[in-house]
């Protein structure tokens, strides 16, 4: 029984998520999203990778500000240095080094961990992901 806020920029995805979870969703881009209240945790699995690096930085800062002290923030990106259009969609890939640039200026982060994992989807075993775990200072 967790209370969650469903956020996506796609009307169709918002409808599907609301139907699946049985609650309303917020249809908003992450750049425009204005968190209401505060959160114990944020789960952004492959959610922010379609933003430019500059926008990722500002969104991460905004979302970190909405976390309770001691709150956790998970996000993932395709692993690499690429930024641009791929297969008709925009992607920002990150490495451990470019992640540090995204996190620059976040003074309320107590702990940062990252792990590289392989994609588990069929036919994509060679693709890598950068998984990032942040904890807000208590």
Can you say where each PLM-predicted feature lies in the sequence?
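A short SAM/SAH-binding and catalytic strip from SAM-dependent methyltransferases
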Residues: 40-55
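Conserved S-adenosyl-L-methionine
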Residues: 108-120
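Core SAM-dependent methyltransferase catalytic element
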Residues: 119-138
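Conserved beta-strand signature within the Rossmann-like core of class I S-adenosyl-L-methionine
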Residues: 70-77
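Short alpha-helix
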Residues: 91-107
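A short glycine-rich, Lys/Arg-flanked "PGG" loop and its adjoining helix->strand segment in the class I
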Residues: 57-69
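Class I SAM-dependent methyltransferase SAM/SAH-binding core
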Residues: 1-33
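A short acidic, Gly/Pro-enriched loop at the edge of an enzyme's catalytic core
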Residues: 31-42
């Amino acid at each position: 029984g967790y209370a969650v806020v469903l956020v996506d920029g796609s009307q169709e995805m918002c409808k599907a998520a609301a139907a699946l979870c049985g609650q309303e969703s917020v249809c908003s881009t992450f750049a425009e999203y204005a968190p209401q209240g505060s959160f114990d945790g944020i789960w952004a699995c492959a959610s922010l990778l379609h933003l430019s690096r500059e926008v990722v930085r500002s969104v991460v800062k905004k979302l970190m500000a909405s976390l309770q002290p001691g709150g956790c923030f998970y996000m993932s990106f395709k692993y690499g240095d690429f930024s641009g259009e791929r297969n008709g969609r925009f992607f920002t890939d990150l490495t451990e080094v470019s992640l540090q640039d995204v996190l620059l200026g976040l003074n309320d982060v107590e702990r940062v961990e990252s792990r590289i994992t392989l994609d588990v989807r069929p036919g994509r075993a060679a693709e890598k992901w950068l998984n990032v775990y942040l904890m807000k200072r208590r």
